[in-house]
């Protein structure tokens, strides 16, 4: 009580930049922050670890979110309360097309909202799509760095094992049918946060 800190992230306005890189694993934050100029530790609470630093003189932050949409939404809501406005999700995913190889960059032009969190924010018919300028900047960067990349729709889900071992689930046939449909629709990859 009386603190200006956000409840879950323990962040204050002067500790974070307007631009935020989000990653699931708290152990990745320091490594990612090492690419920032003058990076420094800001906070560590629950699954939320934060470092800040500079890119071309602009304050930016790296924040872990834990796994899934719900914990990602908590981080984003608190960061938005502090004035953050641009988020870039960096993490792992599972390729759904044979041409998406390990180590390739997947740039999401949209996400299938097969999770429960975003239903609290928008009707399911509303698509989860990124800001066009941010999407374009990602493609431009991948080209500039000559990295193998793919741009397209991805799947965001709540259950890691439900898609990777659907036969172990009571709703096996439903999960398998959806997976097969997404593959036929040329979905690039599957993960758990980007639709948030």
Residue ranges with predicted function:
Residues 43, 189-190:
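Short Gly/Pro-enriched turn/cap motifs at secondary-structure boundaries
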Residues 191-196:
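Short glycine-rich, acidic/polar surface loops and turns
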Residues 1-136:
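Metabolite-binding pocket within alpha/beta catalytic cores that recognizes anionic/polar moieties
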Residues 129-186:
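Active-site rim beta-loop-alpha module in soluble metabolic enzymes
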Residues 18, 58, 147-148, 188:
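Short, well-ordered coil/turn segments that N-cap beta-strands
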């Amino acid at each position: 009580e009386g603190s200006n800190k956000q409840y879950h992230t323990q962040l204050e306005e002067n500790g974070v930049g307007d631009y935020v890189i989000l990653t699931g694993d708290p152990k990745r934050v320091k490594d990612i922050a090492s690419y920032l100029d003058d990076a420094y530790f800001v906070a560590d609470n629950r699954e939320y670890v934060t470092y800040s630093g500079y890119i071309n003189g602009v304050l930016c932050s790296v924040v872990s979110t834990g796994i899934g949409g719900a914990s990602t939404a908590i981080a984003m809501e608190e960061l938005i309360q502090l004035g953050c406005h641009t988020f870039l999700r960096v993490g792992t995913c599972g390729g759904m097309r044979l041409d998406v190889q390990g180590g390739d960059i997947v740039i999401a032009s949209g996400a299938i909202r097969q999770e429960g969190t975003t239903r609290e924010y928008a009707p399911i018919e509303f698509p989860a799509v990124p800001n066009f300028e941010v999407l374009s900047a990602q493609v431009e960067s991948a080209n500039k760095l000559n990295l193998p990349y793919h741009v397209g729709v991805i799947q965001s889900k709540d259950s890691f094992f439900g898609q990777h071992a659907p036969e172990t689930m009571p709703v096996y046939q439903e999960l398998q049918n959806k997976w097969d449909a997404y593959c036929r629709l040329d979905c690039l990859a599957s993960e758990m946060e980007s639709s948030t």
